[in-house]
Regions:
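Hydrophobic structural elements of the Rossmann-like NAD(P)H-binding subdomain
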Residues: 15, 57-60, 70
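Residue(s) in the substrate-gating loop at a strand-loop-helix junction
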Residues: 19
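Active-site helix of classical SDR
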Residues: 35
């Protein structure tokens, strides 16, 4: 895809989704946390490499989110107290729809308190 984005010369946006697990150490989460940290690093590197082509690269790292997997792993957790997938989707929509230059290459952490 990046090959075609470069050729378009119209300026594009890439948004990658990582996780707070990639920036917060947790025992027993080595593989998952490492893969999410790699997404953050990849996004930052791509932002540098693609800037000359007017391609903006963002990364978001959601915290706890009410998904089917989360319900399975933490069945006693109150799902209403954590982020809903729709909330993450709204943030993604806002990031992609705005012409925000100062966020290029940033990892944006989103959490529900």
């Amino acid at each position: 895809c990046v090959k075609y984005m470069k050729a378009s010369k119209q300026g594009c946006k890439i948004l990658n989704v990582a996780s707070t697990a990639g920036i917060t150490p947790r025992p027993g989460w080595l593989s998952y946390a490492s893969s999410k940290a790699a997404i953050v690093s990849m996004s930052q590197t791509l932002a540098e490499e693609l800037a000359e082509y007017r391609i903006k690269v963002y990364c978001i790292s959601p915290g706890r989110c009410a998904t089917a997997l989360r319900r399975k792993l933490a069945p006693s957790e109150d799902q209403s107290q954590i982020m809903q997938p729709e909330e993450v989707g709204e943030i993604i929509t806002q990031l992609i729809s705005q012409n925000e230059h100062c966020l290029d290459g940033q990892n944006i952490v989103i959490r529900k308190k």
